[in-house]
C-alpha cells in the first residue's frame, strides 16, 4: 500500500517538492518552516512537518482528502497548517496551489500597522492587487485556518498573517510561488521607498493593468 502511494501523483509531488526547495533557496523560509500544497482532484498534496525544506523528495509529500481532512499517507506527519490549506481549497474552487512561508520583509509588515504598497511597480499590482492582512490567530489552530480561508474566499491571493508570515493562492505551484516572491519584493520596495522619493502607478493605469489579469 505504501509503495503504491509513493508512485501515485509522482509528477505533482515533484512539483511541490521543487517549489519548496526554491522557496528555501530564495530565502523565503527557514529550514523547517513554511508549507506548500497542490490540489489534484479531490486530494491535496502538502509538504510534511519537521523535514528539511531544502531537500524534499516526491516520496516525502503527504496526501490529504480535501473533503474529509483524512491523512491518506498516515506514515507522514502532516504540517500543522494542513487545515488552513484544506479550507482554502474547500472555499475557493479556483485555488490550485497555496504557498505559506515567513519571508523577512513580509514578516516585518505582518507585525506592523503599515501596509505593503503594491502600486510601486506594475508586476506587483498585476500579480497581487492589494495585500490583505489577516488578524492574528495562533499558528496551527482551526481559528487561523478559518480566518485565512475566509479572506481567500473573498478573492484575495496575497495575504499577510498578522505576527506570523505570508500566504499566496495560485492557479499552479509556480503561480502561487511567483505571487509570494512578488509580495516579498513589494514589501522590500515599500521599505526602501521610505529612503527616496517615489510615486506609485496612478489609478487609471492600475485599472488598465487589472484588465490584463
Where are these regions (language model features)?
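Glycine-rich flexible loops
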Residues: 2-213
Amino acid at each position: 500500500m505504501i509503495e503504491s502511494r509513493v508512485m501515485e501523483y509522482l509528477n505533482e509531488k515533484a512539483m511541490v517538492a521543487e517549489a519548496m526547495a526554491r522557496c528555501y533557496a530564495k530565502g523565503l523560509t527557514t529550514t523547517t518552516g513554511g508549507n506548500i500544497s497542490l490540489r489534484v482532484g479531490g486530494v491535496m498534496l502538502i509538504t510534511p512537518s519537521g523535514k528539511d525544506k531544502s531537500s524534499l523528495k516526491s516520496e516525502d509529500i503527504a496526501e490529504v482528502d480535501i473533503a474529509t481532512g483524512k491523512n491518506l499517507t498516515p506514515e507522514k506527519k502532516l504540517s500543522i497548517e494542513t487545515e488552513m490549506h484544506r479550507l482554502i481549497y474547500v472555499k475557493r474552487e479556483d485555488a490550485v496551489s497555496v504557498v505559506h512561508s515567513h519571508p523577512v520583509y513580509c514578516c516585518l509588515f505582518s507585525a506592523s500597522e503599515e501596509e505593503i504598497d503594491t502600486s510601486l511597480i506594475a508586476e506587483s499590482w498585476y500579480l497581487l492587487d492589494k495585500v490583505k492582512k489577516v488578524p492574528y490567530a495562533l499558528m496551527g489552530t482551526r481559528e487561523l485556518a478559518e480566518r485565512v480561508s475566509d479572506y481567500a474566499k473573498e478573492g484575495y491571493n496575497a495575504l499577510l498573517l498578522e505576527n506570523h508570515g505570508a500566504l499566496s493562492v495560485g492557479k499552479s505551484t509556480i503561480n502561487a510561488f511567483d505571487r509570494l516572491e512578488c509580495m516579498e519584493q513589494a514589501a522590500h520596495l515599500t521599505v526602501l521607498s521610505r529612503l527616496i522619493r517615489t510615486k506609485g502607478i496612478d489609478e487609471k493605469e492600475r485599472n488598465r493593468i487589472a484588465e490584463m489579469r
